[in-house]
């Protein structure tokens, strides 16, 4: 999980979602692409 000020999709499988007011990126193909805004 990377914590970043600016979250962007890294690959085409990444999805940007908002969970409890926190913007997150989840990825089915590569778990290293997981990000959270913070």
Swiss-Prot record:
The keyword Cell cycle does not apply. InterPro entries: Ribosomal_bL36, Ribosomal_bL36_sp. One of its GO terms (molecular function) is structural constituent of ribosome. GO terms for biological process: translation. Keywords: Ribonucleoprotein, Ribosomal protein. GO terms for cellular component: cytoplasm; ribonucleoprotein complex; ribosome. Belongs to the bacterial ribosomal protein bL36 family. PANTHER family: 50S RIBOSOMAL PROTEIN L36, CHLOROPLASTIC, LARGE RIBOSOMAL SUBUNIT PROTEIN BL36C. This is Large ribosomal subunit protein bL36. The gene is rpmJ.
């Amino acid at each position: 999980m990377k914590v970043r000020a600016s979250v962007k999709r890294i690959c085409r499988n990444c999805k940007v979602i908002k969970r409890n007011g926190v913007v997150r990126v989840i990825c089915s193909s590569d778990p290293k692409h997981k990000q959270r805004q913070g």
